[in-house]
Structure formats: C-alpha cells, structure tokens
From Swiss-Prot:
It comes from Homo sapiens (Human). [4Fe-4S] cluster binds at C379, C382, C385, C425. The gene is NDUFV1. One of its GO terms (cellular component) is mitochondrial inner membrane. It is an enzyme of class 7 (translocase). Belongs to the complex I 51 kDa subunit family. Core subunit of respiratory chain NADH dehydrogenase (Complex I) which is composed of 45 different subunits. This is a component of the flavoprotein-sulfur (FP) fragment of the enzyme. Interacts with RAB5IF. This is NADH dehydrogenase [ubiquinone] flavoprotein 1, mitochondrial.
Length: 464
C-alpha cells in the first residue's frame, strides 16, 4: 500500500522517546517462526468459518470489549506501546506513539479515525482477507482505536474494486449497530462511536494518507503538503489519524491478551505477528499469519510449498510489495522478515507482500512493468515524480530490448536518486527503489543484454 512512509529511513520528532518491545530484561529470542495456532490473531483468514457476528463472537471477537473501553484511553495506549506494534501498512512507525498524538486538549473540533483499506500495492492482498472474512475484528479495532484517541467516528476508505469486501463490511456494520456494539453508547460503555464506509474509485495514489483524506472530502486524490499533519488538520479540517486495516484489527487482541504477550513475538523493535502474502513462482501462493522476524526461506518453503522447481531455481524476491527493492537468492538464504533486517539488506518490509521470481523470469522486463504501473498511477503533482518516472519508464523499455549504452545505467541510477525523497508523497520513492534494486543486484544482466543487442545490430548492418 502506498503508505505515509519513507520506508528506508523514518525518523521521530525531537525529544520523543519510544519504548519498543525489546526494552525489557527478558532473554533475547534467537529463533523465530512456526507460530502456534493458539497465538494467531486472524482465525478466519481463509473464510472457512462464518464471518458474520455470530461466528465472530464464537471466535472471541467483541469479548469484554466494554471492559477495555472503560479502562480508558491511557490504558489502551499503554498496552499498544508496550506491545511494540509498528504500522502494518508499510511505514513501520510506532503505533502507540502515533495514536498518542491525538490526545491533546480538545479545541472543540471532533476527532476522527480513518482506516486505510485502499489496498492497491501490486502483490498485496492481506487487508482484503480481513475485510472479507474477519470484518468484525476490524470494527472492534476501530472502536478500541477510536477510544484510545478520543475519536467521534471512523471512516473506512475501501478500494473501489473491492466490491465483495465492501458488501461484507456493510453487513458487519449493520449487525454491530443492531447489537449495540457501535453507535450511541457503544457496548454499553457510555462512549458514542460511529463507523462509515467510503468507496474509492481505483486510484493507487489514494493509499497515501493525505490523498485519501482529500478523496473522502470529495476532492481529487492528490497528496497534501505537510505540515500541517493529519493529527492537527485532517479530514474535514479536524484532527485525524490514518491507520492500516491490519494495524487497527490487531489492537483489541493486544488489549485482551496484553501488550507483553504481543511483544513476545519477533525481534527487538520488530515485535508481534504479521500477515504475509506469498505470490509469484511458488507452488502454493497464500496469505499467512506468522511471527515477525521469521526467515524468508522458511516462510516460502513451509507455507507456500517452496519455489517452483526447487529453492535452487530461485532468482530473486521482492519482499514487501512492488515498491521495495528486490533481493537476490544469496540474500534470501538468511534474511529475516522484519523491518530492521530488511533495511540492513537494502530493501524493506513494506506490506510484507512477498513476490517470488524463479529463473524463468525476465527480471528486467518485470521491473520495467512495475515502473509502468507507477508512471500510470502518478498524480502528476510533483515534477520529479511526473517527469522522472515517465523518463525511467521510457529508459526501462529500451533496457528490456537492450537498446541502450552501459553508461545509461548510471544515468538511470542518478535519476532515481533525484526522484527519491524529493516528492510530496512516497510514490516517487516507490518507483525509484525497484530500479535501484535491479541495478544493485542485476547490473551484469543489463550490460549483457546491451552487449547482445549491439552485436545483433552490427550483424544486421553487416548483412545489409
């Protein structure tokens, strides 16, 4: 998802201290993965059970929600901070800290929670599984998150193409209202909280939080300059927090089972469980919930049935959705699937959408296709993105044929660096990073293709 992010280097405001899950005296874990069924938060990920209210209640949703609400915002925020939960939409920003930005003295304006369900990142399909098969878990998360930040209502902005998901969500909202779980005096807690659904229109750019807010307000989905940040001036000019579907949906379970329980999974600063999408050249593509910091190789071999043709047939993996740089097989052997480990590997966790490519893949053509996507989805507001991504798209089309000179590889790298970090939102970064990953790890393939094209061109000239 096009997040509110700079994936490879987010920073915190000055004088803000963050407590991550690893700030304890407990012995550090050294192995990760093999999540037990009793520790899974999403128990209907594959839609094998009833997704309506009756089925959700039987699986533990809405259990003692009233007690959670009555404990108040400070307690909820404390548990979220203790858990070490970081944003699951790509940014990886500490959720407890982000939600606490809303807890300022009221100036009379209502506060809102906006849930980003505009899942448009190629390769990513985790949030739609929650919307389709566990909508009540999301609604309960909206209520708990809204209580934590004193929000009056939640707006769930759902991708326009998600027709069935939106339909299920609307049914779940109606059930929750009829049961008194949301609305006036939600769960009998004395807290009033409404939930509204807003349908998108198929624009990838609206996955960026301020473009999403613009779209909710009925305007063109174009990112806003920041500051002011949404926590000060968001939807309808009111304080707003924009959060990912998965981030919101796990919050009630964290409050019920305790932040310390959630922090017990994964490495320091990378705690909890996570939904991973595994697609591409694997035997059994799937969406699976696993422990953070699970080895990438184990994730593919255990849950997706392995790479087609065996592990030795692996060429490269895009580990976090199309906007994250690819990594070759040599890196995939040992890398862990969490924020910090993938940053060290010069890529990112992103949305944890693992795209596997075997040796049959034309890696240059694959990356060129991604650049074409970003060129198509650019809103055109920023010159580096509008002009730079269009230029990269044209150059990559020539690179696919080999119709270029080796010196142009360096020019492409330089242009990608000029786009990165010089745009209002992160779409420019998302277009630049796949190119950088390709050049970093597959430059010899580019040069060989150019050499082959030049030889064929010379042969044709000689023949004529």
């Amino acid at each position: 998802m096009l997040a509110t992010r700079r994936l490879l280097g987010w920073s915190l405001p000055a004088r803000v201290s963050v407590r991550f899950s690893g700030d304890t005296t407990a012995p550090k874990k050294t192995s990760f993965g093999s999540l037990k069924d009793e520790d899974r938060i999403f128990t209907n990920l594959y839609g094998r059970h009833d997704w309506r209210l009756k089925g959700s209640l039987s699986r533990g949703d809405w259990y003692k929600t009233k007690e959670i609400l009555l404990k108040g915002p400070d307690w909820i925020l404390g548990e979220i901070k203790t858990s070490g939960l970081r944003g699951r939409g790509g940014a990886g920003f500490p959720t407890g800290l982000k939600w606490s930005f809303m807890n300022k003295p009221s100036d009379g304006r209502p506060k809102y929670l906006v849930v980003n369900a505009d899942e448009g990142e190629p390769g990513t399909c985790k949030d739609r599984e929650i919307l389709r098969h566990d909508p009540h878990k999301l609604l309960e998360g909206c209520l708990v998150g809204g209580r934590a930040m004193g929000a009056r209502a939640a707006y769930i902005y759902i991708r326009g193409e998600f027709y069935n998901e939106a339909s299920n969500l609307q049914v779940a909202i109606r059930e929750a209202y009829e049961a008194g779980l949301i609305g006036k005096n939600a769960c009998g807690s004395g807290y009033d909280f409404d939930v509204f659904v807003v349908r998108g229109a198929g624009a990838y750019i609206c996955g960026e939080e301020t473009a999403l807010i613009e779209s909710i307000e009925g305007k063109q989905g174009k990112p806003r300059l920041k500051p002011p940040f949404p926590a000060d001036v968001g939807v309808f000019g009111c304080p707003t927090t924009v959060a990912n579907v998965e981030t919101v949906a796990v919050s009630p379970t964290i409050c019920r089972r305790g932040g310390t329980w959630f922090a017990g999974f994964g490495r320091e600063r990378n705690s909890g469980t996570k939904l991973f999408n595994i697609s591409g050249h694997v035997n059994h593509p799937c969406t699976v919930e696993e422990e953070m910091s699970v080895p990438l190789k184990e994730l593919i071999e255990k849950h997706a049935g392995g790479v087609t043709g065996g592990w030795d047939n692996l060429l490269a993996v895009i580990p976090g959705g199309s906007s994250t740089p690819l990594i070759p097989k040599s890196v995939c052997e040992t890398v862990l699937m969490d924020f910090d480990a993938l940053v060290q590997a010069q890529t990112g966790l992103g949305t944890a959408a693992v795209i596997v490519m075997d040796r049959s893949t034309d890696i240059v053509k694959a990356i060129a296709r991604l650049i074409e996507f970003y060129k198509h989805e650019s809103c055109g507001q920023c010159t580096p993105c509008r002009e730079g991504v269009d230029w990269m798209n044209k150059v990559m089309a020539r690179f696919v044929r080999g119709d270029a000179r080796p010196a142009e590889i360096d020019s492409l790298w330089e242009i990608s660096k000029q786009i990165e970090g010089h745009t209002i939102c992160a779409l420019g970064d998302g277009a630049a990073w796949p190119v950088q990953g390709l050049i970093r790890h597959f430059r010899p393939e580019l040069e060989e293709r150019m050499q082959r094209f030049a030889q064929q061109h010379q042969a044709r000239q000689a023949a004529s």
